[in-house]
């Protein structure tokens, strides 16, 4: 009798949980910025540093992952990633209120869960790309939509929890969020792992990737996508409160929550209708919208218009990250873990640099986040130029992946 074929649906579902874990890691702590400033005396520059530590740690893991993940194996590495995320969230909830220097405790917790976040980012995309699927670009976009739904859930649940139990209850909430990576550990423990590089395809080394101009273009696109996405997302809550003058509950729900909703909608649309859409055309039109919304958020004096611009920025950046992954996998099928790791490095660089630049520019201009976002519009402008170059030199009219 022939062996039963592995059921990779469980694997893909576990990857969805992995991206929800990543969303909790990246989006829970920024909701506490105003609380940290008021109760712990942490200024905007040091708050900006917290974001940077998170994404730079993930960046370092991304760099190293290409060297050790294939050697150790995907299953032990993805489980270890969720264990680190679990430990970091528990540390965030338990340590800051129990030590003399809460800022150092927060930094330590961020470092722990960022180790897990970096591994998750590197691994879930190639796992889903390797799982059998008729339209891989659609599957990739759907995977990344779960980051958005995770972000939306993180913001909405956290906001309602803090409203119901008070902002002082945030340590309890941090411990409750640790349930998500615990679920991921259980799911990946029983999930089969696919072959990452297609059978019969040679695995590309760094020397092979470095000889391909398309790799550098994809790297720059990922850099800009991360900066444009997180430059708005990480500061949306604080921008709504301080820049637009709305309450914290309204600011969190209409700022980062609406951003996540629209980003998830964009990715889900392509995840469902991707076989009917041209990927590069979708990215190009989204880039134009991104530029317009950054400028609107920075220049408007109307709170409603500013919140709308923030939300539509989420829609505009939604396809950038998964779309670039799909384009790269199509152009370099032998890229494997190394290619995804290097592209994740570019994305992490953008995620770290984007909000840091916005925060530093704001700090240098009287803590004006409007000025920071105005400067941040350059991320979307550069991204638009990359998309135009990609359409001309890389894929042109791209067919759906099979």
Show where each model-derived region lies.
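Extracytoplasmic
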Residues: 10-42, 125, 232-237, 354
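Central cavity-lining transmembrane alpha-helices of secondary-active solute carriers
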Residues: 49-67, 257-269
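Cytoplasmic helix-loop-helix junction between adjacent transmembrane helices
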Residues: 109-145
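C-terminal ends and interior cores of transmembrane alpha-helices
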Residues: 83-100, 289-301
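Extracytoplasmic gate region of multi-pass secondary transporters
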Residues: 29-30, 212-265
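Primarily marks hydrophobic transmembrane alpha-helices of the MFS/SLC 12-helix fold
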Residues: 75-78, 283
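Helix-loop-helix hairpin linking two adjacent transmembrane segments in secondary transporters
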Residues: 134-135, 139-196
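Interfacial helix-cap and linker-helix signal at transmembrane-aqueous boundaries
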Residues: 36-37, 68-69, 160-166, 240-241, ...
